Amino acid sequence: MAAVGSAVGLGNIWGFPNKMGASGGFTFLIIYLILAVLCGFIVMVGELAIGRKTGHGAVGAYKALSKKFKWMGWLGILSAFFILFFYCALGGYCIKYTVLNIGDLFGAGFGSNGLSGGEIFGNFLGSPAEGVIYGLIFVALTMLIVMGGIGGGIEKVCSVGMPALFVALLICIIRACTLEGTDVAVQILQADGSLVEGVVNGSALDGLKYMFSPGWAANVGYYVPAKAVVDGAEVSSIMVNGVAQAIVAYKSGAPSIFNVVSTAGGQMFFSLSLGMGAMITYGSYLHKKENLQKNALLIIIMDTMVALMAGLCVMPARFALDPAGNIGGPKLLFITMQNVFHSMGTLGPIFGILFYLLVVFAAISSSISLLEVIVAHFVDKARIEGKGDKRKPYTLIAAACVCLGCILVCADCLGSSGIAPANILNIAEPKNWAADWLDFWDALSEGVMMPLGALLMSLMIGWEIGPEFVKEEAEQSGHAMGSYGFFKVCVKFITPLCMILILYGQIKEFFF
């Protein structure tokens, strides 16, 4: 259950639904599932086998196989650090919004005080100190759980939290899909440059179409995939808060198949926590009786289910009640969804608390696995050197290091404070990696280090130590590795090839 918690995170809540809708809908889902089988399953079984065989975390596991692979473990630890820098910042944001909705429920002064989602988020970003405080609270929660160890803290939290997450998502899905659409008055920008009053029609069904329509979704490169109508005629763009935004029909703008494969692959590795040592670390705690194939398949299925359920919760609500709102990245959670809860009247704060609490849990279930990757290495090392149980001090030291990166991300305020990499390096037209510190750490980890780590691991198993190594370890459970023939072909040929394409696409997207 801890491994499932590692896989389920923020990438499921906003990343998967938004990328699925923007990159082909049902077509994206099919490509994602194919990659999950050809790459995700193969890499996960390999990482779990390495961890269980050696009984060590990422660095110790690779070192036990061969000293020349030790650096690959450090690559995983660096990835974990970089992800934690922005993950804890976003987790802190979610805590802030949980508190805010509690304030709305009881009419307290720390509620929204009648402000819109955009105004609330703008004020929050305008207060770096508040962001830092909530980010550090999230780091502290993660640290306390990891101090309890895999059995005393991590597994207990995930065993209770994961079922609760599914129930909370189900409640939100039922509510979201039964919402009546709201027609939003907007200013329509005509071809001649004049502005007229018009309407964007809200519909929960549009959210489902956005995610599941086969073929390419229309809103590639745009934030508004709805249709606006003036006097019975469709128009091309609208003004939202004084900014012109294009409106296009579904299926009108097609991304290349390569971009879809790359996007799906990057999402898969980030969502499944592959290529950063988390599954190696959790594998080291698995009993020999555990069926590695079954565990890997269960993790992939449950992770994908949560991602789809999150989409069924978020997208219908967003399209029904805020059809003219932005839908990308953090704004989906902290502007659009907050506007959705505002529009629900007295029930809004209740659903807001429920929603943001489940997002906090999804975030913390992943953050504890990331911190465990780091801590496990030093705990293993201390045990081997006869220094006893050093989990608590090493967890404290690792968390302190995470705090430094988290403070930088929070103080940057998503690039609005003037300390983003683009500002420091004086880049006039920054690429994705330089826009803010969140994107910088994301580009290094998700864009490069995670797919690179998975590629190197598959090459190591396929061509250096041999796939028989995984077969022998998998069959320690007493179950035959029925997928061995498939695993062998994939780990030697198909998975590395897919990984090279995904890595190239990720580097191209983030840096060029």
Where on the chain are the PLM-derived regions?
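Select transmembrane alpha-helical segments in multipass membrane proteins
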Residues: M1-A3, F28-I31, K68-F81, G135-L136, ...
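Transmembrane helix-boundary motif of multi-pass solute transporters/channels
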Residues: M1-L33, G277-A278, K294-L297, I301-M302
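Juxtamembrane transmembrane-helix boundary signature
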Residues: M1-V4, I31-S66, C88, A317, ...
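Membrane-water interface regions at transmembrane-helix termini and the short interhelical loops
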Residues: K19-S23, A49, K53, A64-L65, ...
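Inter-helical loop and helix-membrane interface segments of multi-pass membrane transporters/permeases
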Residues: K19-S23, H56-W71, L75, A89-G151, ...
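C-terminal membrane-solvent junction of multi-pass transporters and transport-like membrane proteins
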Residues: L75, V375, K381-C401, F440-M499
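Loop-to-transmembrane helix boundary motifs in multi-pass membrane proteins
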Residues: A129-I133, M302-L308, G352, F361-I364, ...
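Membrane-embedded translocation segments of transport machinery
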Residues: S159-I368, A382-Y394
